[in-house]
Amino acid sequence: KEIEEGARAIGAGYMVIGDAAMARRALNAVREAFDAALTFDDPQVHADVTKPQKIVAVTGVTGTMGQETLKQLLPRGNRFKIRAFARPSEVNREKMKKIAAPNLEVVWGDLGNYEDIKKLVDGADYVLHIGAMVSPAADKYPEKTLYTNIGSTLSIIKAIKEQPDPDKVHFVYVGTVAETGTRTYPIHWGRVGDPINPSIFDYYALSKVFSELAVYESGLKHWVSIRQTGQYPSNE
C-alpha cells in the first residue's frame, strides 16, 4: 500500500508510517493505556460484553518493550486475548510465570521457525512484531541477526496471507530510528521523512531496513511501521 501524505505522524516517542487511520488509532491506544488504571480486580475487566475478544499476537514479550506492552494489554481482558510468543528458555519461562493471566496464552517457539510463527498468527486479529535480535548481540552475530529479524518478518507476512481472510488482520511492525542513521550531536533529532541511511556495520539497523521494506511491499491491507526510539524499563 502506498504511503499516504497524511500518514506521517510523530507521537508518544514513535515515528509512524503506513496506514494513516491505523497509525492514529495506535497512538491513541498508547495514550489511553497510560491514562487507564485498570487491574484484574476492576469490574470492567471481567464485564460481560456482546463482542468476542480480539486476539492480539505479540512477539518479543520478554524484552523491555514487550513487557510494557503486556502490562498495557493484559488488564483489558474484556476486550483482548493476548497470545504471547517467547523463546522457551528457563529465564523466559520464569518471567512469563510471573505475569500469568486468564486472557494470556503463551506460544513457545523460535522466530526463525515458520511453523512456530504460524501458530502465533493463526486466528489473530492483530499482530505486533516487537521481537528482534538487538545490539550488542546483533553486533556480535550479524548473520544470525539478519536471518532472525528479516526472516521472522517475512514469516509473519506469509502467515497472515495464509489466513482465511488476510484483510481482517492488522499488522504492527516495530522498526527503529536507527534505520535513518546516527543521531549524535549536533544533529540529534529525526523526522519521518529523513532518508534511509543506516550506520556502517550496524546490522541491526540494516535488518530493520530490509524488514520494513518487506512490510511496505507485502500487499497487506492493514499495516503500520513504528520506528521506535529508545525506552527504559518502568522499574528502573
Language model segments and positions:
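A conserved FAD-binding loop/helix module that cradles the flavin
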Residues: I17-D48
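Flexible, glycine-rich beta-alpha linker
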Residues: E179-G181, D202-Y203, W223-E236
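NAD(P)H-binding glycine-rich loop region in Rossmannoid oxidoreductase-like domains
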Residues: L104, W108-T148
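Active-site Tyr-X1-5-Lys
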Residues: Y185, S199-V224
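Glycine-rich beta-alpha-beta "Rossmann" dinucleotide-binding loop(s) and their flanking helix/strand
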Residues: K1-A20
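Glycine-rich NAD(P)-binding loop of the Rossmann-fold in SDR/ketoreductase-type enzymes
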Residues: G112, K144-S155, P198, D202, ...
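N-terminal Rossmann NAD(P)H-binding glycine-rich loop of SDR-like oxidoreductase domains
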Residues: Q53-N78
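Conserved Rossmann-fold NAD(P)-dependent oxidoreductase catalytic core, especially the SDR/UDP-sugar
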Residues: L154-F201
